[in-house]
Amino acid sequence: MDKQRLCIERELISSSAPIIWDLISTDAGLSRWMADSVTQEGEQLTFVWGELWSHHEVRTATIVEKVKNQYIKVTWDDEDGPDNFFELRMDKSHITNDYMLTITDFAWDDEMDSLHSIWTDNLARLRNTCGI
């Protein structure tokens, strides 16, 4: 049984490609909305959720594709298979002139609701902390 694909598209309240690109492709940007802490060493990303001195989760991932001001594709190091990645893609809306953020991720059938909820929370944090 294969994982199911989750695709979420949100319009961002920004027409600034450099600001959005920084938020989706750098450790400092991702730390503002996707995890409590993100560090980068080369193509390796380390995500930390929670506080290190208490309950927390740490996952590492590798950037496998990155096209500036377009998309970043990241694979989880603790998973195998063709569906072990997430992708963050930015596209400019020709109607509003703002950018759209498209998130592609994968989960097992029984984890789809949870994954959707995680990304919805992440997007709310992106809007609340960064104003976009």
Task: Tell me what each language-model feature is.
Residues I20-W21, L30, L45-F47, I63, ...:
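Hydrophobic pocket/interface hotspot
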